[in-house]
Amino acid sequence: MCCLFGFIDYNHNLSGKQKNRLLRSLASAAEERGTDAAGIAYHAGGRLHIMKKAKPAHVLRFRIPLETSVVMGHTRYATQGDAKKAYNAHPFQGQIGGKKFALAHNGVLLNDRILHKTENLPKTHIGTDSYVAVQLLEKQNALNFNSLRKVAEQVQGTFVFTVLDAQDNLYFVHGDNPLCLYHFPKQGIYVYASTQSILEHGLTASGLSFLKKPVEVKTDEGDILRIDRHGERKLQHFCINSFCPPCYSDAIEWYPKPLSAGRRNPDAYWEGLVSVAASFGYTPKDIHTLRECGFTSDEIEDFLYCGEI
């Protein structure tokens, strides 16, 4: 459980003081979903800046320059990777064609280790599941709707991604985790957070009383929304991954039945597990990779049938 937050001041109506007040209020409110680390990404002076530390957001007192109009942020609740290492905090930096981008993720990815093997991704000291999304984008050598769609359809688990590219386009890739986005058309401002309660709390705490009567911009699971630095929106979609079907019941005969624990012998059981995995679109190599990573046969079987390890 982490939190995404940020804003787009596309009409440049906020003063420097107002921007920083809003940023800090959102970041502090986002601590509700994580205090292990916090970070932000933004452009200034013609380059991407990422500030992140393994500390709660309120301690960091984020500050951005007046020229910055788009900022994305993240508070971390560590689930994978050393919580004390700043390089495991979000946002992460990537690079495509000499241009840097930033990515943050709320959720848990279950197949990052499989993707490292199957996609031949480079080794990294970063220990989080989220970083695989950066590597997948870099491998495609493109950052656009098509490349984001492919990543969203490759990963397994829960997610909302925010991605800031070199042109100050902010992408929202909406999986099955929460996201709340407000638009203030009169002021020319978008503000977002992972939940409505956090967003409302951050706005109230900012003291920016002129931010009233927002229009909620709805996004659903399977949506990819891009907002450019001028406030223009474009929406595309990805296929919602169907890797995790309902657990088997007698009423659903087309899903293969779980193997009985009472009749297992180790070799035969692993062979059966490989056969069952093929019904879900996974190769023998995928199962052997999970086994080599230390997952037990029971854990892999749970993953296949219920999406849980």
Q: Where do the PLM segments sit?
A:
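Conserved short alpha-helical segments that host acidic/polar catalytic motifs at enzyme active sites
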Residues: 1-309
